[in-house]
Amino acid sequence: MTRSSIILGAPIQSGTHQPGCVMGPASLRTAGLIASLEALGWRIEDQGDLSIGPQEAMAHANPAVHHLAETRAWIALLAARAEAAAAQSDLPVFLGGDHSMSAGTMAGVAAHAARLGRPLFVLWLDAHPDLHSLDTTESGNLHGTPVAYACGLGDFAAYPPLAHAIDPSRLCMMGIRSVDPAEHRRILDHGIEVHDMRAIDETGVVAPLRAFIERVKAANGLLHVSFDVDFLDPGIAPAVGTTVPGGATFREAHLIMEYLCDAGVVTSLDLVELNPFLDERGRTASLICDLAASLFGRRVLDRQTRSFA
């Protein structure tokens, strides 16, 4: 039976000071994302890009916080649309946009999981844990808050009410290599599973990923994958405003996506923080499209390769 995917763009950049993420969804489409997935036999429904209207400014006790009203509106909209997309397709893909959008997408797919009576797990592929609350962020950039919000950790009275918080024990973070003190405390306090780049260097990506997937399967869970461009090493993926040296290699990233495909447990996907303004002739957008295709079933033998015989 043909599997289906809804594609939904969220050109949001209110969660960061760095302009350019607003162009992310268009860049991924231009790089051929939809054609690549259709070539793998998926039925794709591109629902275009979401938008919000003008918002009345909201103040916060933390003076660093900026664009709070816009981010709140995006979260509310994305939560509703992500819940619907998860119900209407096998593996919806949400195109960012900065990572604050995942506060909305995770809230939405968590609501969908709750309706099905199944637990939601999250694989967080990122250089950062994004575990700030509004009172702990020093930069005021709200793309650093989605995990804390989605798990109900900290004061988020200014965000939309969260109906279904994700259990922090069902998180798995990989590729982490930049953690602020407040985030570190939350990781320790809640026992969040984190595999930083040192751990990946020591064990490889498959061992922790296999163990996490076994937990998802044992619980009959749904799995949301949130993929931030800065998970990758900036040497292969320069189009991100939060580059951190020492990220995942081309092969490590493809191996993760191929392994996830083989496991058959992924039920939703974020592709976030692509900033085409910082790209080099579209190389990062093309790489992200290739990685998404690996998750959707592409293998090396699916491609035409040049023979040197």
How should each PLM-predicted stretch be described?
Residues 179-189:
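Short, glycine/polar-rich helix-capping loops at beta-to-alpha or helix-loop-helix junctions
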Residues 132, 179-181, 276-278:
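Active-site environment of divalent metal-dependent phosphoester hydrolases
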Residues 91-160, 170, 263:
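Active-site histidine-anchored catalytic micro-motif
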Residues 165, 169-181:
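An alpha-beta-alpha
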Residues 12, 98-99, 127, 176-177, ...:
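Active-site metal-binding loops of divalent metal-dependent hydrolases
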Residues 165-169, 187-189, 218-220:
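Short gly/pro-enriched beta-turn/loop segments at secondary-structure junctions
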Residues 2-12, 18-93, 101, 105, ...:
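Catalytic cores of soluble, metal-dependent hydrolases
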